[in-house]
Structures are given as structure tokens and as C-alpha cells.
């Protein structure tokens, strides 16, 4: 079996896969340990039943041990050795270009990247150390959100700042959501019956965190997020791209230091900042149709910024666009967000089929009409399955 782990500073999302068929692993259990170091709660779903526990979780090691003990107690596994490998989602892998077995060199790279992802990498490090103690025989694999974007050309990843900043301090565009983009590229190769290395896509990963990526010949060619996940399109609570001078200006205006202003740009901006009310797209679209001016302002800006990047990436692909894909929480589920973005793309001659856009679906659906010059789809991403597959390939 394969365990997939996505750990934060106080939470662990986990999913267990049966890998008897290595080419088609099946997820059998999905769970969450949360409020680690505060008080603690563990919940998971197995065979249609939900299990919930309130338990003291002083650290990640105790949380993982509790999870494994419950899996044994419920006869889901007979012992920890039934799990032969663990795949970790790691947000920042520096310049590592593919999923990797975690050896000392890879682990040191993850630690070095903490300064680039201070909100995300520490949780992964803590979880890796905990699982090494609790599951000493398991093979450990790191899957990086940055790895997929290591194919960017220099003109895409460099910033117009002193070159020494890049050479000496690693200041460059890294990009994120790479595990999701990797999954979507593979899925779209199946859907369109086209070899992945010939695939040209514009993929909109729109969740609370959001980014858009231009995929050319199956590889990341450009992407919206940058050195950190703060850059690019407008998001739930993140600003996306702004004039860098705003930071110094608002430090002086509000008498706050840089870290506090950066925190506002990360946690109090985006949809939440412009509406002053909510970061949840369901609230925003609901308010929009009730005539709420604050939500109108937020949604109009969000959809315009997204459309602007799609046009920019369409230019990079020329007349060879196999499809525009919407994925992640907002992209998969928000009918009106998709519609409003597509309506802001007159140059692309896209024709939306409103009935298709509104209907429920399984893994994917077309939302463009047969007359549309470019195919448009909503596709459900599956980062955990992608991590599982990479883990199997590296450990079999």
C-alpha cells in the first residue's frame, strides 16, 4: 500500500492507496489530522463510513502513530509494514526537477527551501522526520509543486532585477501547483487521445490559491506564480501581481514593517480584500447576483486578471491550442466564474455551451460547443493520485 501525506504546521491530510495493480492504484481511505499542538482531532472515511476521534496530538509523530494504530485496529492494515512507501507533497523543492526518493541531499534541499516557502515546507519536514521514526522500513518520496515548472526557459523564469540576485540568492520564478498540472497534462492526453509531448494547453488551477500555466508540448512553458505563491492572478486572500512599490508605500502609510504588509497581501487581499467580506467564491458569486457592489467589484477584477493571463499564454501557443482547462475548487465547481472569464476572451472565438457548463459531471466535461474554435473543459484534478503514481514508479 501507498500512503500519501500533505502536511501543514498543524495538520496532516492523508490518503491510503491499494497498489496491487501498480498501473491503477485505488484510494481506499481519505483522512485528516488537525489542530496538532493545540488539542487534536482525527477523521477519515473508509468504505462509506466516517470515523472521528478527539485526541491529544502534541506533535506530528503522535498524530501519525495514532492514525496507524487506528488503521491496524480496524483491520485496514495488519501492521505498519503493509505500507511500503509514503509520498509527500512538498510545496517548494528549489531547482529539483522531478519527484525524488528522500535521501539526505533531497532532505537538505527541502530544508534550504524553507526561506522560500516558510508557510509550507516546515510542515512537510516535520512529517518526514516523524514518519522516518514511526515507519522506519517505508521508502519515502517527495513530490514537489515546483518541479513541473523547471522546464521554463530563462526568459520566462528570470526577473528584471540584478542578475546577481538570481545567481547568489535564487531569486527567480519557480511556479507552484505543479503536481496538479502534471496530473491534468496526463489526463488531457487520455481525453484528447493525443501524446502528452504534443499537447498544448492553458490550464487554470483556480482554488483559494490560484495559478494559470501554459503547457507547450506537454511541459510547463510559463506560469503565473513566481518566487512564492503570492504572485500571479488574484486569489481568495492573496493579491497576485501588484506594483512592488506598494509595499514600501504602505509600510510608511500604515507604520507597519514589511512582514506585516506581506502578511496582509497573503491573507487579507484578493477576493477578501476587494470585497471586504469573503474569500469564498460561492459567497462572491452569490452576492454578485444579488447586486452587491462589493462582490461585483471583486469578481470583475478576479475574472479580468485571469482572462488577461489566458490571452498572454494563448499568444505563446499561437494557433496550436488543444484546450483551455479549468480545475481545482473554483475552476471545477464555479459555473459563473468560468463563464465570466471566458466571456472576457473575444479574441479566442470561444463558444460556451451553457447547458454543458451547468451540468454535473464525473472526472471531466466539455463546456465549449462543437463550433468553438478552442475546446474548453472542466477537469477534476487529483494531486494525491499523481503523488501515489510517482511514489510507485520510484519505489517499485
From Swiss-Prot:
State the similarity comment: Belongs to the acetokinase family.
Site (Transition state stabilizer) location in chain: 177, 238
Which residues are recorded as binding substrate?
89
Cellular localization per UniProt: Cytoplasm
Q: Which UniProt keywords apply?
A: ATP-binding, Cytoplasm, Kinase, Magnesium, Metal-binding, Nucleotide-binding, Transferase
Which residues of this UniProt protein bind ATP?
A: 13, 205-209, 280-282, 329-333
This protein's name: Acetate kinase
Q: Which organism is it from?
A: Mesoplasma florum (strain ATCC 33453 / NBRC 100688 / NCTC 11704 / L1)
> Binding residues for Mg(2+), per the UniProt record?
6, 383
